[in-house]
Every structure is written in C-alpha cells, then in structure tokens.
Amino acid sequence: MGLRHLVLCPGSRSGPLALAAGGMARTNRLRLSTAIDERSAAFLALGFSTATGTAAAVVTTSGTAVANLLPAAVEADRSCQPLLLLTADRPYRLKDCGANQTVNQETFLSPACRWIGQGPREGLHLFSKETLESFAEKAWQRAHHPAGAVHLNLPFEEPLHLSEEEQRMIWKGWSPKIPRSSPIKPINLAMAAEGTNGVTDQAPFALDPLRPGVVIAGAWRGLSKDLFAFQQSLREWQALSGWPVLADPLSALPSDQPGLIRSWELLLATGLLGSQEQLQVLRLGPMSASRSLEAWLKSFGDGQLLITEGDSRCLDPLGLSVQWNHGLTSWWQHHHHRWIDADAASQQATKALLRKWQISDRFAQEWLDQQLPLQGAITEPALARWLSRLLPTELPIMLAASSPVRDWLAYADKSLFSRRCFSFRGASGIDGTLSLSMGLAMALGPTLLVSGDLALLHDSNGWLLAHPQRPPLVVVLIDNGGGGIFEQLLVKTAPSEAFEQLFAMPQEVDPLALAGAHNIPHRQVACLEDLPAALEWGLFQAGPVLIRVCTHRRQDSSMRQQLREGLMMHLQSISQNGHIDL
C-alpha cells in the first residue's frame, strides 16, 4: 500500500503484528522503530508522516496502551496529517466479563479519526487474504483522503506467537497486490463539525486582482506532494495582483516568494499599517497565532476568501470568510483564464500598497538588527532572530507551541523562509514535542528543535527514541523556569507567588542531567556570542544533542513590549521625515 515506517510498542496481544513487522523489516520492506511509551511512539510516527506526507503506523497492545494514542490522533486530525494506529485487542468473548487487560478500546479514538476499522470480533484469523487486503487498502485511503488518523482495532485469538518456521511460511505467501478498486470518495469533515459557517462547495469565490488586496498565508496543512503546485499557484496570483503576502513561518513559502512581508506581525501590532481602507483578503489555511492579525482582519468585515487544502471543516473563528476547501491550486485553475491579458500589478493603488508594506518591512528589519545584535545575554527575541541565520540553509526547524512559534512569527528574519518550519498549530498542544521532532529528523535528516523547558520535560520520554536509531536532532532548550507564554497572555489576576504556582509552574529538574541519563551529549550556552560554536558542535554530532540556554521570562516579556513600542516610535519618526507614508 505504501507503508514505509512502523513504530512498535511492547505487548503480548500484539505479538502477531510485532512478528509480521519484524519479518518485513528483515527483508527491507519496512523501516521499524521501537518505543516503550505509546504516546511518544504515536508522535514519533506523526513526525515521520508530517515530513513525508505518507502515513506511518503505530502498533500497540490492548488496554490503556490504546488511550495513550489519543493526543497524537487529535493533532493528526487537526493538522491534517496521515497516521495509522494499529491496536491489538482481545476477542469479543472476553469483553465485559472482567477479563484481564480488556477494555472498550474500539471507541477510545473515534472522535479524532477519519475511520475506525474493526477486525472480526472473534479474531483477525477469520479474515481471508482478499478481505484483509481490501481492509488494509481502505484504511490507507482513509488516512490520506482527507489526511488524518485511522484506527484499526484488531482482535487476536490465541495462540499469539508462532514459531519462526511458521512465520516464514506466512511471509513467503504474503504478496500484497496493487490496489484494485477505485479510490474511496473522500469524506466530508464538515459533516461532523458543529457548524459549517461560510463553507461552500459551490463555484469558487472570485477575487478581483485589479483592486488592492492582501494575501494572508497561514500554516501549510496540505500533503508534501502538493506543496510545489501550491507555491507556484501563489506565485502566479501574486505576479498578477501585486498584493503583499503576509506569511506565517509555518506557511512553507520560499524565501523568494514575490511580495513576501517578514515583519507583518510587529507592523500590525504598532497599529500604523492597520488603516481602514477596504482591502480584499485572500486567506490561505488556518489563522496564525496573532491577535493583531485578528483585529486587523475584523476591520475589513466579511467577504474574505479562505482557501484550505482539503479540510472541509470551518477554519474561520472570525466568521468573516467564504471558505473554499479544494486547495489554492484548484481555485487558481478555475480562475486564471479570466485574467490572461490583465496587468493588475501595475494599478497605482496596488503598487502604493505593496510599496508601503515593503518599505515598512525593510525599516523594521533594519531596526531589529540594531536592537537584537549577536552579543550579550541571551533573550528569546534574539534567539528567534539569530538561530535561522546561523543554521545551514534548508535545515528544517521544529518550533514548540507557545512562546517559540510566536517569537519566530515576530522576530525571525527573511532567512527563515529558506527552510521548512514545523509546529503544533493543529491542536496547539505541547504533547509529543520531542518525539515528533525525532520523527522529523529520521525522515528529513539534520533538524533543529526549539523548545521551552516545560514542553521538553512534558515529553522527556522522547529521549528514549535516541537509541538505536540516533536521529540527527539538535534540541535548543530555552530554559526560562516555567511557562513563559503566560507572561505574554497578560495573566494578572494573581499575585506573583500565586502566578508561579498556578500558571508558570517551574520545575526543579536539571535538563542537562536528564539528557546525560539518556546518554545524550549536552552543552550549556551562556551568551549569544557562544551560540554559533554551540550550533556547529551540535550539528557535528552523530545523533541527538541538547543545547541549553537560560533566559528570564519576565524580562523577556517586558522586552517584547519595549520592542513593539520602540518600533512604533521609529516608524513614526521615519514617516515624519518623509521616508514613508503611513
């Protein structure tokens, strides 16, 4: 069917699946990883799926092992990434009678899955070879159209463990055929949603490239195979319209995308470019983590166009858009013939709009370079600015949810778009941050993870995945003594001591000692000047490494506010001197 990577968790009831996976791995038909923590295993597989656009699989035994798959299933559902969850189960005769390790696991994952495939109640051995092939084919298609998690719950009757000779006989006779049936019709995710506000399958909504507008590119939620066509369609639309492109670091747009504006989040936060002129809005994918953007979009009212890459659920929390779910490439194919001879980008109003954004962006980037030099104490804004510059071109980056992804949105420079960036912007959790990054590194090669201390500690079992595969992952740990994101969310309803206890929750754990306990090479960086050498050291290692930097979350929170206010005054001064018309 196309399965290339499987993560196996320990268990007895799943013994037949383990033996089959081992046999396929020995004949190089499958890449096999092992993990003792099912939650970590599922995120490892999800990382591989996210990197390749093709589903990886997880195998678990019965019982609570299945419940641990739910966080990854939720993230796969919301980020639209394929994932196969194979769980062994007891036969039906052992259900609801107090049998050991027997629960109603067939229902555990259903809210987050594209499809639940239930094997024969008395045991998978009752499936014929043809039925099993059809069952597997359907699961594979459901995991990819539209992409998400599929759960196969597979009862096994004893005996569970065959001899090696019996296993060989099975493997010799196993020769899966190319899928015979026509593709399964994709399910409509919106049918299961609580509402379909603004979602349409009618003729796609048309924008007018002869009038000014703006493109808002959120996180990419399509499959890897569709990315180039998406990028090319946007390039052609921008060449026609001349609109500025406000892109999220997770948008998967290249650094040479015409009209790309890097500092848009900070510029919107100043309020100087948030004019009330009526602009058309083309939104691609989900909303970025920016309240300034939300407020700005609200000022334009309804009639905005939101295009998703196959996700038919409503993705507009603002309720202002018409939503087209069949992808930018499909939308562009519907409309490009209308404007073959148009020269919309030469329209004076559009040219003035793009020029204002580009000049403001250039001044903002130059000002940030002055404010965030590569020297002195380490701050989170400075890390976001410099890490991408110091890394090899095209090296992928995984950004933990909460502070890192927001800082890179605001402070990273244009070099960020020379590489793919990943993050949890589906369900926006911190589950599995390290484990998913391990999966990315296994699939893509050298990769960098930027994580806070709580996110890394929450998934510390991910360090167990370092051996024996040794994925080339450099982990930059921002240790600010707790949940730094809450300093930014203006939680001021509690005194300082209560804030630390109820929100920040600092942990008394030495992350370097924890890494050392897992035989992970580690290093502490004391100042920004030492960062280049530390990154060079980390990338030179053969497997995962930890680079720890310590920051002060309260001071960094104040610094972010000072940067926003300072940029506003800087741009106002430039405008008064006639260098830019705001």
Curated annotation (Swiss-Prot):
GO terms for biological process: menaquinone biosynthetic process; phylloquinone biosynthetic process. It is an enzyme of class 2 (transferase). Homodimer. Belongs to the TPP enzyme family. MenD subfamily. HAMAP family: MenD. Keywords: Magnesium, Manganese, Metal-binding, Thiamine pyrophosphate, Transferase. It catalyses: isochorismate + 2-oxoglutarate + H(+) = 5-enolpyruvoyl-6-hydroxy-2-succinyl-cyclohex-3-ene-1-carboxylate + CO2. Pathway: Quinol/quinone metabolism; 1,4-dihydroxy-2-naphthoate biosynthesis; 1,4-dihydroxy-2-naphthoate from chorismate: step 2/7; Cofactor biosynthesis; phylloquinone biosynthesis. Its EC number is 2.2.1.9. It comes from the Bacteria. Its cofactor is Mg(2+); Mn(2+); thiamine diphosphate. This is 2-succinyl-5-enolpyruvyl-6-hydroxy-3-cyclohexene-1-carboxylate synthase. Catalyzes the thiamine diphosphate-dependent decarboxylation of 2-oxoglutarate and the subsequent addition of the resulting succinic semialdehyde-thiamine pyrophosphate anion to isochorismate to yield 2-succinyl-5-enolpyruvyl-6-hydroxy-3-cyclohexene-1-carboxylate (SEPHCHC). One of its GO terms (molecular function) is 2-succinyl-5-enolpyruvyl-6-hydroxy-3-cyclohexene-1-carboxylic-acid synthase activity. Gene3D superfamilies: 3.40.50.970, TPP-binding domain (3.40.50.1220). Binds 1 thiamine pyrophosphate per subunit. InterPro entries: MenaQ_synth_MenD, THDP-binding, Thiamin_PyroP_enz_TPP-bd_dom, TPP_enzyme_TPP-bd. Pfam families: TPP_enzyme_C, TPP_enzyme_N.
